[in-house]
Amino acid sequence: MTYSIRIADLPLTERPRERLLSLGAQSLSNAELLAILLATGQGKGKLSAVGLGQHILKELSQHKRDPLDVLRDMSPQELMNIPGIGPAKATTILAAIELGKRAFQLRPMEKVEINDPVSAVAALSHDLMWQNQERFAIVLLNVKNQIIGTKLISIGTATETLVHPREIFREVLKQGATKLIIGHNHPSGNVAPSQEDIDLTEQLLKAATFLNFPLLDHLILGNGNHQSLRTVTDLWIRYPQEG
């Protein structure tokens, strides 16, 4: 398949819209999903919609980051610098990205029970998942592990955030919570815990044990990924928490 073949000239089984209808959106490549948003290519004899989608991804791959990660942060003007992308195409792409963010970041209703890292990630996503600066937030729980609320504690730089145990447990007391989950984001999308993350978690587990407010997990979020320190460290074995 070449970039200049029109979608209308493709067999039905190879057209992005038809493939989405028959196989589901998850079966399409990134270029095919972009092609559906673009609707048209660059015109006769030039790139088709799929070809233009491939060209966009190729251009963005020069940033040494995942092309979709780059695309997520682009402004309309930056998108329109790519040949073949005008205001209509740029705004359609960015509207789709924003809608996806909002769907992913929906807050759970209060009193939802947190029983695994995934449900806690859903509670923290609005504040942490797609942010360009490091942020630290907490999920406040009652005795039944139901959400009382979430609270953004601090906002740092692109690479670090500063938080003190006093700020965290003050909020726990203020909201009448009995347990908590803490979380922060890595804007890079690499959710592997750093030594600083591990050290902070140990410090907070000691404080939680002393104050009798069980700390159930420390989650790292970023660009659609997440990691639970409870599952990848032995800290909760060394500092057992009720609940």
From Swiss-Prot:
Keywords: Hydrolase, Metal-binding, Metalloprotease, Protease, Zinc. The keyword Chaperone does not apply. One of its GO terms (biological process) is proteolysis. A motif (JAMM motif) lies at residues 184-197. Gene3D superfamilies: Cytidine Deaminase, domain 2 (3.40.140.10). SUPFAM superfamilies: RuvA domain 2-like. InterPro entries: MPN, RadC_JAB, RuvA_2-like, UPF0758, UPF0758_CS, UPF0758_N. Belongs to the UPF0758 family. This is UPF0758 protein PCC7424_2073. One of its GO terms (molecular function) is metallopeptidase activity. It comes from Gloeothece citriformis (strain PCC 7424) (Cyanothece sp. (strain PCC 7424)). Pfam families: RadC (PF04002), UPF0758_N (PF20582). Residues 112-235 form the MPN domain. Zn(2+) binds at H184, H186, D197.
